């Protein structure tokens, strides 16, 4: 526990941190990578280049300083980060490195005096212990469960299938022929990629897209125009190739009782965690109403359309509505899609007709912000709204 003086000193630095902004974490990462370039094998350098990771870390530091007297308020954030850390194989020995360069950054940017540096060192130590303990639990759980493993395991690509012009799916089976760890629908896999074209090892997280089956995993990857790893996966990796995988992780997953109505809302590749949820609801013969709402540019980039249609034909409690922003001439209204333009939920009165309904959504950030506002405007309780950000987390 932190003493009152330490807490007071840390809280007194909040205005300084806020005024500095992500410049703080930019300096931190530059310093840490200079002294420990091997950590570039862990961190997503694309997120470093875009500034997303710097912003996410800055927000986390400010949230910790603000809630330092009430760490319980940070537990959801701790869980989300711990899940990601274990997908990246973060170990206890990494925390002193981060702490050293965080304190050095504060000193170099602000020269706040030894009392402030000591207070932040204590505060960081407490937070590091929280993460180390939780991550140890996650590692141990995934190692001891049926089909589980602790860090990395070799998987063979047994099926590669083009699902749209930009999305490709990969079915993965353990090279050792054993079972695979159960996962919660909505969680992701960490994929470790080493290739002659890459300067460093790259790690990416991709959502699982089927119901758990104990034998294989399926992920789907969107080919981004400037995406180093996504283009490599699409163009270079083929059936028979081996990839190393961390166990399923993630704090975004389907968690409802059999009588709970569910709305699954997505845009683009954001449908991938929803697809796992839909397949699971179907396999479990979920009795309550399920709504599938999806937005895509057009049929050329609408992945898994046939799979969802096949489920809808066998699942009478599933309602499906698809929006195409700019349909092609070959896209059939009423068959391939139901509405043209952007997804608009304002006229869907059923959204709020059942106080038990839970809402899960994923997609590009502007889409999620728009959907979040629409749900809240219809009086949906925030605790029944669940969302996933691909990449560093953002509050919508």
From Swiss-Prot:
One of its GO terms (biological process) is cellular response to nitrosative stress. InterPro entries: Cbr1-like_FAD-bd_dom, FAD-bd_FR_type, Flavoprot_Pyr_Nucl_cyt_Rdtase, FNR_nucleotide-bd, Globin, Globin-like_sf, Globin/Proto, Hmp. The record marks 84, 388 as: Influences the redox potential of the prosthetic heme and FAD groups. It is an enzyme of class 1 (oxidoreductase). Residues 147-396 are annotated as: Reductase. It catalyses: 2 nitric oxide + NADPH + 2 O2 = 2 nitrate + NADP(+) + H(+); 2 nitric oxide + NADH + 2 O2 = 2 nitrate + NAD(+) + H(+). FAD binds at residues 188, 204-207, 389-392. The gene is hmp. The active site is at residues 95, 135. NCBIfam families: PRK13289.1 (NF009805). Consists of two distinct domains; an N-terminal heme-containing oxygen-binding domain and a C-terminal reductase domain with binding sites for FAD and NAD(P)H. Its EC number is 1.14.12.17. Residues 150-255 form the FAD-binding FR-type domain. Binds 1 heme b (iron(II)-protoporphyrin IX) group per subunit. Binds 1 FAD per subunit. One of its GO terms (molecular function) is FAD binding. This is Flavohemoprotein. SUPFAM superfamilies: Ferredoxin reductase-like, C-terminal NADP-linked domain (SSF52343), Globin-like (SSF46458), Riboflavin synthase domain-like (SSF63380).
